[in-house]
């Protein structure tokens, strides 16, 4: 069922239904009661990469790129997100220094409501399920760097922001990064 003002159909592809259903990328959709297609067949991600729209609605993988809910978010919500991003700029830079070349980018996200962090791929990159399929078939898969997204409202991220000890900050950052994989 599509909500009023919804201009995209959202989907998530995973190895199985349970993994798709429990993806951290779905948290904001659950909170806003937006339905997402849960895809668990091996061919689904490939198929969705070739289907650009359905009945005039653009299809969007919720685990790729930046998340734009369009008219489903009010102007006030968008302004609050921009303010939060500004407040966390210093933390983002500190985390970039720690994770360095492991990621393409570190950024604050509103995609997460319960989880402290997640990794997403760029909009035009191959998804993780497709990578696993190709690797299991013995195909060479191009190396890509993912985007490390942080939930600014999570207590762990807030603790990280306040951490002054650089060694402890690095350790906590790397644990958070590893848990996101």
Please report, for each region that a protein language model flagged, where it lies by residue.
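Long, intrinsically disordered, charge-dense linkers/tails
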Residues: 1-181
């Amino acid at each position: 069922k599509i909500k009023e003002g919804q201009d995209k159909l959202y989907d998530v592809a995973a190895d199985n239904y349970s993994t798709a259903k429990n993806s951290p990328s779905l948290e904001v959709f659950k909170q806003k009661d937006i339905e997402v297609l849960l895809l668990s067949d091996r061919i689904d991600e490939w198929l969705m990469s070739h289907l650009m729209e359905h009945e005039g609605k653009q299809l969007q993988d919720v685990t790729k790129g930046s998340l734009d809910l369009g008219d489903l978010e009010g102007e006030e919500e968008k302004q609050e997100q921009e303010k939060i991003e500004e407040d966390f700029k210093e933390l983002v830079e500190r985390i970039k220094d720690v994770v360095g070349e492991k990621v393409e980018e570190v950024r604050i996200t509103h995609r997460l409501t319960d989880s402290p962090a997640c990794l997403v791929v760029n909009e035009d990159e191959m998804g993780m399920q497709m990578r696993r399929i190709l690797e299991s078939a013995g195909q060479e898969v191009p190396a890509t760097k993912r985007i490390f997204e942080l939930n600014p409202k999570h207590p762990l991220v807030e603790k990280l922001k306040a951490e002054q000890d650089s060694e402890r900050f690095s350790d906590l950052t790397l644990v958070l990064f590893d848990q996101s994989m």
